[in-house]
């Protein structure tokens, strides 16, 4: 599962997830992409589930790029523990997603197969997504 090798600080504050994605909003590496149309938090497990769904559907053909990385730690206190006594321990990692962000990219497969593969990955995501193609200038 994806998570940072090391961080400056173990825990982070919540912060707000506002605005649109100005970086990572275009298909850069592949021919087709899965782009978020809503905002949210995607966990490392969800990213991996989406990757597996895509790779199982396209079988041997094509190459996949994961364009998001879970770099935000989410903490949780154990069950039945009273309030206070400090912040809980890191439970899992998430990537914060703004509308417009490209989550996955594929190349080397037909458009129809790419659409089906991304539909399967989109079912695993907690954000709404859309299929996008590389814009040739």
Swiss-Prot record:
Listed under subunit, the entry gives:
Part of the 50S ribosomal subunit.
Keywords, in A-Z order: Ribonucleoprotein, Ribosomal protein, RNA-binding, rRNA-binding, tRNA-binding
Which InterPro entries does the entry mention?
Answer: Ribosomal_uL16, Ribosomal_uL16_bact-type, Ribosomal_uL16_CS, Ribosomal_uL16_dom, Ribosomal_uL16_sf
Tell me which Gene Ontology terms the entry assigns under biological process: translation
Protein name in UniProt = Large ribosomal subunit protein uL16
What's the stated role of this polypeptide?
Answer: Binds 23S rRNA and is also seen to make contacts with the A and possibly P site tRNAs.
Q: Where is this region: Disordered?
A: 1-20
- Specify the taxonomic lineage: Bacteria, Pseudomonadati, Pseudomonadota, Gammaproteobacteria, Thiotrichales
Cellular-component GO terms for this entry: cytosolic large ribosomal subunit
Q: Which family does it belong to?
A: Belongs to the universal ribosomal protein uL16 family.
| Family annotation (SUPFAM superfamilies) | Ribosomal protein L16p/L10e (SSF54686)
What GO molecular function annotations does the UniProt record carry, in alphabetical order? rRNA binding; structural constituent of ribosome; tRNA binding
């Amino acid at each position: 599962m994806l998570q940072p090798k090391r961080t400056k600080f173990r825990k982070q504050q919540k912060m707000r997830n506002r605005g649109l994605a100005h970086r990572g909003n275009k298909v850069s590496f592949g021919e087709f992409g899965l782009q978020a149309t809503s905002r949210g938090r995607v966990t490392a497990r969800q990213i991996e589930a989406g990757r597996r769904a895509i790779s199982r559907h396209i079988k041997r053909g094509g190459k996949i790029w994961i364009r998001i990385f879970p770099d935000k730690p989410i903490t949780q206190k154990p069950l039945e523990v009273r309030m206070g006594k400090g912040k809980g321990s890191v439970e899992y990692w998430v990537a914060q997603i703004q509308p417009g962000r490209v989550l996955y990219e594929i190349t080397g497969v037909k458009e129809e197969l790419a659409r089906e593969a991304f539909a399967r990955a989109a079912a695993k995501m907690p954000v709404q997504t859309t299929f996008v193609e590389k814009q040739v200038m």
